[in-house]
Amino acid sequence: MALHTKDDKFAHLLAMYCEFDDWARAHDVKVFLDWGTLLGAVRHRGFIPWDFDLDISATWGDYQRLLKAWDEDPLPNRAIVNIYRNPGYPSLFSRLVDTTTTEIRRASAWDLAPCGMSIDIFPLVPLPKDPKERERAKDAMLVFYELTNHMMLNKRSRRKSMRRLLAKSLVKRRIFGEKRVLEDLHRIAFSTPEEECTAYMELTGGSVDACVIEKDVLGTYKELPFEGHMSYVPEKYIEFLQAGYGVTWRNYPSNRSGGYHYVENLDIPYDVYVHDYMQFLDKEKVLKNYRTFKAKELQDVLMRAHVSPEYCRTSLQPARLRVEAFGSPSEYAEGVPEDLEAALTDYVNAQIASKPWYWRVWGGLSDEWIALACRIFFDRGMYNKIMHIITQRSWSLDEPLPESILEVKNKIEAIFRVYNAIDYDDTDEVRRLVAQDGAVLDALVSTHADLYLHSCDAEGEDDWRAVAEAAETALAAFPGDDEIERRQAVAYAHIGRTDEASAMLEDIIVRSNNGMTVLAAKDDRKELGLDERN
């Protein structure tokens, strides 16, 4: 197959998306950017350079209208594929496929459906308001996914209630057949009227809690540019990103070389692969093996559920004992030695690792020690780690969080409410939050908020000179802070120190790990006319 570059693929996906978005709008359907594509729109105004795909979503009502409109008026050389239209297809969500191209995926390239260059379309299913009914619906949806997908095992969480329903459903399937079991699960999972719901569950590859979306976060949608195409995004798109990626979504990941496992061709239709190559493959045998192995994997999950959680719990004990050997957490109110910090870090890293997360296992370290770890991580700015350990603690123990942990959690939430308001460029909200939460905000976020407000209020040269002086003072307390230096550079540009401003902004663009700061610095250079100077 002919080679193509990532830029070729991005250009192809963008053309597909623009065509489909225009079609959707013409048919009174709203699809919005999601996952890495939404993150790219907000942080890069386009594709994330190290990403590989394009993701969009639709609420349940829009999704149903989309499928109906497609049946009546499809786009040429395109197909929408999912388990309902293509029996045996392994995904609950849909894909928009370009049938003039080829994209061979491990599980779906068996002539089950057209398999070309594609865009994921994730439907958002309404969830019940009642907490118990909501959990029941989420479990039913996960088990429904497991029993309709005969190719891949869900690698996400295995909480007890979901395992119980899976075991019960497998027994019922042997007795009553698959059709009845799936109908029962479908009724539980998909029966909540959208007008009555306050949250959705997003149908991705079988995910659980991380994909619950509050209805008010979606709101009435906004539009942001994605590679120049104005696109729908959730009204509270920053909170949406926080729910999916954590509070540090603004930062670039340390590993930007994500794996890629597809074979693609932009010029050869998938039919050519089916007719010319699949004749050498035993399709029926492979699909039969998939079903056999999937059934064994489900039984294996249920068998391991009696052993693996306890094994995880046991494996956490050495890290727990190393922490507890330091005595009582109350002894370290005035300071924590490095070896205790290291022991707490090791325990938390082990606790939030994939296997304890998968089985919802808690290693037993007391809340007092967890509170101490949270305070240490807070001082280091490791906010995602704190939120992960708090989430794991909440999932695993049916007990309310103590005040000592809630205090740290509330501080983090207060900090990021301010940063969210700054990124929304909502000066009134920033002022309100600073007045409301000033007592719990740390010095750095207070400094960022003050410089933001002073910059928004600045009009003449004297105002900008005051901003520059405030930034210089702040840098004495927080040397090398990218956001403070950016505010300083903008102030310098307004008081005639343009060469310094240009160099500072260029340096921030090159070195900063905060994508929103980089984006703002690029905008600053353009708005201040500094790009034209170089």
Segments from the language model and where they lie:
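Active-site nucleotide-donor binding segment shared across nucleotidyl transfer reactions
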Residues: 21-54, 58, 63-64, 216
